[in-house]
């Protein structure tokens, strides 16, 4: 319980009293402890930056499998642009300062470069049998098929409730925890507004090669939008 510092400190010291040879060993102990406390036999970790350390992770954890979810860069851009709104759409625990930071830090060029970099890293593991790349759009359109494939990859049984997902976490809509569904309306939300033509142009221009490699069709521009110069 990280909210209780004394309790958390005591548990940490007890765990770390074991022989620790590397930061990855600490991470392994952390995963084992959290999984045990929650009665789980499988640890599931979703830190995006882990993508940049896949080689080390796969080497240190021989039984680990990785699912890399890829989404249209323009929808990612729209999400990042509106990320600051999460505090007002159901995530009330997000501090106001964090909402302000998200608003100030947004920039289409930076977001596009991060997306492009992550997809470049992803492409290196396309032939790795322990890494499965899933397009977000495919998951929403063919939910049952895609979830079955994911279960097969993970060697776990498919369960019907895997298709019942609370509609939360959006940066453009209010949370709806009572609505349990894989929401296909999330596909190509950027086409419904929210991004300027300049943002779309920059996004596509900076991510062109990776968009082509992962099958994302680009919007055509005869000339660059005039407002591009402001970015």
Language-model regions, residue ranges each:
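Short glycine-/polar-rich loops that comprise or flank the Walker A/P-loop
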Residues: 61-65, 99, 127-131
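Conserved phosphate-donor/acceptor-positioning beta-strand/loop module used by diverse small-molecule
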Residues: 46-49, 56-82
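Extended hydrophobic/aromatic segments used for targeting, binding, or gating
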Residues: 73-121
